[in-house]
Amino acid sequence: MRRWLITLLFMLCCGVSFAQQHDQQQLQKLTQFYNYLRSNYVDEVDLEPLVEEAIKATLSELDPHSSYITAEDLQRMRASFSGEFTGIGISFISLRDTIIVNRVLEGSPAAKAGVKKNDRIIAVDSTSLVGVSTSEAQGKLRGEKGTISTLSIVRGKCDNPLYINIKRDDIPTKSVSLAFRLDNNVGYVRIDSFLSRTLAEEFTQQVNTLGSIDALIIDLRNNSGGLLSSAIRLSELFLNRGDLIVSTDGRKENSTYFASKNGAFRKLPLVILTNEETASASEIFAGAMQDHDRAVIIGHRSFGKGLIQRLVNLPDGSGIKLTIARYLTPSGRVIQRPYQNGDRESYVRDRERYNHLDSVQLAELPTYTSLRNGRTIYGGGGIHPDVYVTLTGESLPFVSALRQSKSISEIIVSIFDSVDIDSFLDRYPTLEAYTNDFTLDREAIDLMISRVHSFNPDLTDDPEGLNKAQDIIKAQIAEEVYGVGTYYLIFGHREDQMLKSAHDIASNPASIRTLLGYSD
């Protein structure tokens, strides 16, 4: 017996040694190839792009999330994780070869310099932006902190440009983009990302501004994630001290993360919205809430991005994100959905399959048990909602054509070419006055009809669709004039099928308890 064990150990050690020797030979082979190439190729060879492509090709054969990052992109990524960006503080769209400002961040250098929404930027430092792509324009507008650029701007119907000097500076970012009250004492908060280290504090502040509420809807749709620490701290707000939030399973190290205190909102009824773009840190939060029977998840199956990447810095300032472990929800579910190494195209395409229950065969999925009430929850990658909402689509042909033609922004810009926001507020000083009294003028309606029929010449008359399209434009104008969130207040919660389902459930806390398996 002892001799057999010694023989087995010897064979295992030899196997490891042979494997290590083989790996070393492959590395030497690669080094020898590049040295020979550099010394003997007929022309002088720049190795930098070749090495970059080799790294990218290698990583592409692994999991879908290991990737190479250029030095420039790595610098921007670090800025995003610090919660601050350097720039002028605007976002913009390209409309008919023109760069048009669609958002000016409050307190940003652009806001202080007088840039306004719907301004057309025709040049930066005498370099024309007419006809350039949004990515090219973004490159021209970027710069180091403290540098100054002159924007040439056309405003409204005035042909003479304005020249505005802007000094680039740090721009604090917000993770919570919307927070408001719906009917029946239901609060609504939309979290766009988990990139900010102060997300939990920002979230708490926004919820407290809502006053006394009986239930809360957290919208995580299209939230691509961010920091693990932010997901943990947000989860703590809704859990009891000692509750498991997430664990990791890796080749070299495993970790577990628990709530360090009783959460301020641990007794607040909670509904969470997810879709196929809800990923990473947002899935950690949603998974913890579902596993502890703290929230009803509504919408679509989430993306299923549950791999942990470690950033490895390379000497030239670039880096690689290398997958080192997997995230597990408190019940032991793997968040990462299945993938085939090297097949990233199918991986990205498949996420769109999970937008309704019919495409998800629950009977084929591994089942788990929730931690408080023992109800059945499903694994197999991503967070499966407790209530699936199948989107029926916008059946009205005119509305569908309007959205597909991407003409809404053009119509909004044309309206504000004729009247500025201050004049608008003089006429409609409150949102209530605007909602009751404002109607689109004939010029805006004709432009909308023209754009829709240019997109689809065969479209027949659709009076109901035309009326709904006017409501959509009206709600978008409200967003421009009265601030972020007003679109949802006057129209969005009626149009948004997922939000409507969430509101119906949140309006009845007893239904939340029933769905979560509580017995009263």
Map each language-model feature to its residues.
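Polar, glycine-rich mid-to-C-terminal structural blocks
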Residues: 281, 293, 304-366
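Hydrophobic beta-strand signal
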Residues: 122-123, 296, 321, 336, ...
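Extended, small/polar residue-biased N-terminal targeting/export presequences
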Residues: 41-102, 148-178, 230, 492-503, ...
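Cleft-lining beta-strand/loop regions that shape enzyme active-site pockets
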Residues: 19-26, 30, 34-42, 46-47, ...
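Short linear motifs in exposed loops
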Residues: 103, 132, 165, 323, ...
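Bacterial Sec-dependent N-terminal signal peptides
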Residues: 1-24
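Conserved functional hotspot residues or short segments at active or partner-binding sites
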Residues: 334-335, 339-520
